[in-house]
From Swiss-Prot:
The lineage of its organism: Bacteria, Pseudomonadati, Pseudomonadota, Gammaproteobacteria, Vibrionales. Binds 1 zinc ion per subunit. Disulfide bonds: none annotated. CDD domains: GTP_cyclohydro2 (cd00641). One of its GO terms (cellular component) is cytosol. Keywords: GTP-binding, Hydrolase, Metal-binding, Nucleotide-binding, Riboflavin biosynthesis, Zinc. Its EC number is 3.5.4.25. Belongs to the GTP cyclohydrolase II family. Its cofactor is Zn(2+). This is GTP cyclohydrolase-2. It comes from Vibrio parahaemolyticus serotype O3:K6 (strain RIMD 2210633). The active site is at D128, R130.
Length: 198
């Protein structure tokens, strides 16, 4: 059974001005170092907190890549939760689970005209290798059973529900369109069935 290992105060956001806590876990299904970032002690003060499962994206979250909208989605969520509370489950699932180097290989194929899913398939991977069991384990360790899920991705909704988490509302993020990510976002809508207006 998963449990919280450590809970530490820190400040987050583009200007490091939003109070939050970062939590580590023990007893998760794998040895990946997933973390939770909690705003306004939402796990203890809210019956149905906002929750976002955000898969690690070094290129988008850290380097603000033009190829995706991951960093913008993360920052939008941090701002929203900084105001109203919530929980970000930051999952170490780079490139929809294929890993950083394979994602860079997929970028090369995307530069040659493939979309994000075609590139992953060409490299021998399924569309999405992520498993959200550990996200459910993290929520259980926090005592959270009902949530308002921040996502555009139907797979996340479906899998969390399968793991027994009650989703009372789905809150979509904005479409963060910029020069370089239009094809990526269109593929997420047409192929991944994401709820985005692009």
């Amino acid at each position: 059974m998963a449990e919280v290992r450590a809970r530490v105060d820190f400040k987050v956001g583009a200007k490091s001005n939003i109070d939050a806590e970062i939590l580590s876990f023990r007893g998760l299904k794998t040895d990946k170092e997933h973390v939770a970032v909690i705003f306004k002690q939402a796990d203890q003060t809210q019956d149905t907190p906002l929750v976002r499962m955000h898969s690690e994206c070094l290129t988008g979250d850290v380097f603000h890549s033009s190829r995706c909208d991951c960093g913008e989605q993360l920052e939008e969520t941090i701002q929203r939760m900084g105001e109203s509370g919530g929980v970000i489950l930051y999952l170490r699932q780079e490139g929809r689970g294929i890993g950083l180097y394979n994602k860079i290989d997929a970028y090369r194929l995307q530069s040659q005209g493939m979309n994000t899913y075609e590139a992953n398939n060409h490299l021998g991977f399924d569309d999405d290798l992520r498993d959200f069991t550990e996200a459910a384990q993290m929520l259980e360790a926090l005592g959270i059973k009902k949530i308002r899920l921040v996502t555009n991705n139907p797979k996340k909704i479906r899998e969390l529900a399968e793991y027994g988490i009650e989703i009372v509302e789905v809150v979509n993020t904005s479409a963060h369109i910029k020069d370089g990510n239009e094809n990526y976002l269109r593929a997420k809508v047409s192929h991944g069935k994401h709820n985005l207006k692009v």
